[in-house]
Amino acid sequence: MAKYQGEVQSLKLDDDSVIEGVSDQVLVAVVVSLALIATLVYALFSRNAHQNIHPENQELVRVLREQLQTEQDAPAAARQQFYTDMYCPICLHQASLPVETNCGHLFCGTCIVAYWRYGSWLGAISCPICRQTVTLLLPVFGENDQSQDVVSLHQDISDYNRRFSGQPRSIMERIMDLPTLLRHAFREMFSVGGLFWMFRIRIILCLMGAFFYLISPLDFVPEALFGILGFLDDFFVIFLLLIYISIMYREVITQRLNR
């Protein structure tokens, strides 16, 4: 009888959780999951709040700014609404025909091309803001305009991407490029005339694979044995799938240039 009462008391202690019927480990897992998802969403749909030129590039940008004659009368072209800061840090004007680098910084298309040609045009440039190597220039303006300036800018961007988009990338550089590439990949995925269907199917299969792995009881690190630590392999698998999607998107851009 005493043994039975002890077991009942032990069960009561085990059930003493913050929310009745839900273990504390599950609550911690949910909170951590939501925090990671919120961080990823913030990284995907936000950019650096401070668009300050890196000290090592200030002199080059100053000279280039004088050459570009920053007094521009032409209005800025149409832009995507999810950008909150539409000012080019090179010319200090509202970004015209904006282009985003793989590191997530926005510039006028003509400004970043001039920055490339004024500097070492034989090699990939370093971002004027964060000094990360720029291997992709992603246009954020519409392609309906077929004016001479827009066509010329598209040719310059394609020329740059054709030269440097296939450069080897370290795992850390791929992680740093992840928010920007995923944002553009998912935007094209849900737009008419964006990504071709085979690539969309591959993205859907990756997302479905991540979902089924999350709900599957078969894990590399079982939650039943390791508790909250058992969720680490789930996040790791999802993280690898996101990196794989960004690599696929980079390959799609390279294939477009070689057509």
UniProtKB/Swiss-Prot annotation:
Residues 47-202, 246-259 are cytoplasmic. The chain crosses the membrane at residues 26-46, 203-223, 225-245. PANTHER family: E3 UBIQUITIN-PROTEIN LIGASE RNF170, RING-TYPE DOMAIN-CONTAINING PROTEIN. It holds the Pfam family zf-RING_UBOX. SMART domains: RING. The keyword Transmembrane applies. A zinc finger (RING-type) spans 88-131. Its main location: endoplasmic reticulum. SUPFAM superfamilies: RING/U-box (SSF57850). Coiled coil: none annotated. The gene is RNF170. It comes from Bos taurus (Bovine). It is found in: Endoplasmic reticulum membrane. This is E3 ubiquitin-protein ligase RNF170. It catalyses: S-ubiquitinyl-[E2 ubiquitin-conjugating enzyme]-L-cysteine + [acceptor protein]-L-lysine = [E2 ubiquitin-conjugating enzyme]-L-cysteine + N(6)-ubiquitinyl-[acceptor protein]-L-lysine. Constitutively associated with the ERLIN1/ERLIN 2 complex. Interacts with activated ITPR1. Pathway: Protein modification; protein ubiquitination.
